[in-house]
């Protein structure tokens, strides 16, 4: 189950880890889209809207859980790299205890707050009942969502990115089958979508537990490993909390930009919504670089191979830049064709083409800043990742989108460029933070 990634070709290690991770992200994106696609076949606009709004709320919660779980991936990776198996076992046990106990509390709090949440997201009156039902079922299933994500984070900390890919594939297939059962055959509407989502993750968790029990690994868990240990919990949370806050803040910024677009009218609002979906697919590559650098970097830091960590960062940036440059150039020529499959309205196509021609450069810069974020997380400096993202959002991304919308009402191109400028600003902060971190490391070595 564990895979040592501290020797051999750096590029080969990156590809070995990142490709399954990329496929996992892709499957997870399909998983999220399945509910909307299937309910649209059997239900009306109100039910589709309910699932759309509810899934956005659940996406934000899931993203924050995944961010917090980054602390587990990094700390376990360091222990594996240092070949400290007792420490790895203690970190795995404490991860399970922390997240599962926390998920039960979170589920109870969310169920209690379901009505205010439905109001906050401005749910249309016709979709309130469906959204409320969808969210209650999903909130009750938060422990299942948490269990899947901590399983994935533990496996990745052990250097195994393939198993989580298989688990999400099982969840995706189960979700589609259950959606057709609950929404198609049983006509349960939004409740059926929520049940399909929750139960499919439960199936995936059960299968992952069976795999863990059957596989032989050098890491052996005992009851004592699940007993909360202050140092282990502190290590996990010190890395995970800044990432969780950062990811939550990013989701809020997307919501703000959506609100800005909504004020421009229906055509621009639709165009921005479509382009956001397209960009989310293209961002799978930069996102996989973040997770790859953090997991591989953590193992090599544990093994004391700091030069190899820098090489991992360089290769990841190179991969991100190459991919970003290819898609950025290509989209300039095929922008309308990229948008057209999502709408038959030619005005929306033209607006979307304008927006994506600017926004696509964010994909180029994101490959760099995401790689730096993974590097900082691997060194336990996730606060630096939170810092550059927060500064980017507050100083460039959101103000830039607002000003672009105000001064360029006839085109969405400047609004798209505002997002790219935000990532470019992040890179500048990352470079400064990187050199500061290297000086800190040299000072420690000299001492």
Where would I find each of the regions flagged by the language model?
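Short alpha-helical transmembrane segments in multi-pass integral membrane proteins
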Residues: 1-18, 76-143, 185-241, 297-362, ...
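Transmembrane helical elements of multi-pass membrane transporters/channels
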Residues: 16-32, 137, 171, 200-204, ...
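Hydrophobic residues within alpha-helical transmembrane segments
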Residues: 19, 23, 54-57, 97-101, ...
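Transmembrane alpha-helix boundary and packing residues in multipass membrane permease domains
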Residues: 21, 25, 37, 74, ...
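Helix-terminus/linker motif at the lipid-water interface of multi-pass membrane proteins
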Residues: 30-49, 118-125, 181-188, 248-281, ...
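Small-residue-rich hydrophobic transmembrane alpha-helices
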Residues: 48-108, 145-164, 258, 271-335, ...
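Short runs within selected transmembrane alpha-helices of multi-pass transporters and secretion channels
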Residues: 69, 137-156, 164-172, 193-208, ...
